[in-house]
A protein has these predicted regions:
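Conserved hydrophobic "DFG−1" position in protein kinase catalytic cores
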Residues: 21-22, 130, 141, 185
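GST-like domain detector, emphasizing the conserved glutathione-binding G-site
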Residues: 1-102
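Phosphate-coordinating loops and pocket residues in cytosolic domains that bind phosphorylated ligands
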Residues: 10, 169, 178-179
Length: 186
């Protein structure tokens, strides 16, 4: 969104967040940051799967979060902001609203709906995204899913709502909120 301060360019050339400063250099991109933290700091009870189906699911969900689930959410956020912001002559507003609706209904809405159905079907038979315990894949997936639940867009998806409640009930999640503070999901 180009809203990050210029000071981030001193940390990473893109000047965007998130970015993590490590002894080996800066790491940008959420998935890479999560994977780095898991590999370097995770305990036995919170680690990356190393083989089999759990590894396949870990890799899939780790990248699905930002590669498939976040793009329609971000596009929706940006288009809705464009609809609401800025001074528009009264006769232009219906045209911009129709344009935004057309973009959302033709592409982003159907893709988001398809992704939500897929996530819902997976969570209907799995507690976590990659194995019997939470992993970095869950760290990646929680933000878009809790954003959807908070916005009311996941009201018809009981398994997604249950998953978000499970994550929110975890002591580690509560500790993270205590350290980082509450946030509004978008």
């Amino acid at each position: 969104t180009n809203l990050a301060p210029d000071s981030l360019r001193a940390v990473h050339p893109l000047g965007r967040s998130p970015v993590l400063s490590t002894p080996d250099g800066a790491i940008a991109e959420s998935g890479a940051i999560v994977e780095y933290l898991v590999r370097h700091y995770a305990s036995e009870s919170f680690c990356s799967p190393t083989e089999g189906e759990a590894l396949q699911q870990y890799l899939f969900w780790l990248h699905f979060a930002e590669g498939s689930l976040m793009p329609p959410l971000v596009a929706n956020l940006v288009l809705e902001k464009a609809r609401q912001k800025g001074a528009k002559p009264f006769f232009i507003k219906p045209i911009t609203n129709k344009l935004v609706d057309g973009i959302l209904n033709a592409y982003y809405g159907p893709n988001l709906a398809q992704s939500l159905r897929y996530v819902e079907s997976y969570l209907a038979s799995h507690t976590w995204f990659a194995g019997d315990e939470p992993t970095g894949a869950d760290v990646q997936m929680i933000f878009p899913l809790e954003s959807l639940v908070a916005s009311g867009k996941a009201k018809d998806f009981a398994a997604i709502q249950g998953y978000v409640k499970r994550v929110h009930a975890r002591p580690a999640y509560q500790q993270a909120l205590a350290k980082g503070g509450e946030y509004a999901y978008a």
